[in-house]
Amino acid sequence: MSFVYKAYEVDIRRSDPSEPPLTISNTEELVAGIKEYYNGLDREVILSCVMDDANRLLGIYEVAKGATGNVEFAFATALRPAVLMGATKVILVHNHPSGDIAPSDQDVQMAKGMFICASMLDMESLDSIIIAGSSYGSVHSHPEFQRWVENDLAAIAQAFTGDGYLTE
C-alpha cells in the first residue's frame, strides 16, 4: 500500500512569461492595478503582493477571505508565495466593505506581525494597504504603527546582536 502526501501546493504562474514583470514605483500604481478585484465584494479579502529587490511584481496571491468586518489569516500563509518566488518585499492589501479606510486595531496588529515575520525571513514588509471603495490608506502611516516602529520595534532590535541571537 502506498500513498502520496502533499504538505501544501501552490500554483504559481504568469499569464505571459515572455512579458517582463511589472515594476511598482509607488502605492498608487499597485492600488490602481488591483482595486478592481475588490469591486462588489461584501467581505474582507487579503492579498499578498510579492516583489523582488527592484520592485518587480512577482505575483499577487489571495491569502484569506473573511466576513464583512474582519478577516483572519496565518502569517505563514501570507509569506509562503514570497518565499517560494524568492521575493524580498511584500505588501499586504485588504478591503473594508464598509467604505471606511481607517485601520482597526486588528489591522494595526496584523501589520506589526507581518513586519516582524517578514523581517525574520530577510524580507521587507513595505506596507499594509486598506482599500475601501475608490479610497485607500496605509496602515504603516497610522500613528500607532509609527509609534511602534519608533519605540517598541527599536527596543526589540536592541535585544538582537549582530549575529542574530537574542542577548540577555
Where are these regions (language model features)?
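N-terminal beta-strand/alpha-helix entry module and adjacent surface
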Residues: 1-87, 106-124, 132-168
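Short, solvent-exposed loop/turn segments at secondary-structure junctions
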Residues: 98-102
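Short beta-strands and strand-loop turn motifs
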Residues: 90-96
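Beta-strand-loop-alpha "switch" segments that mediate conformational coupling across diverse proteins
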Residues: 127
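Conserved beta-strand edge residues that scaffold enzyme active sites
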Residues: 96, 130-132
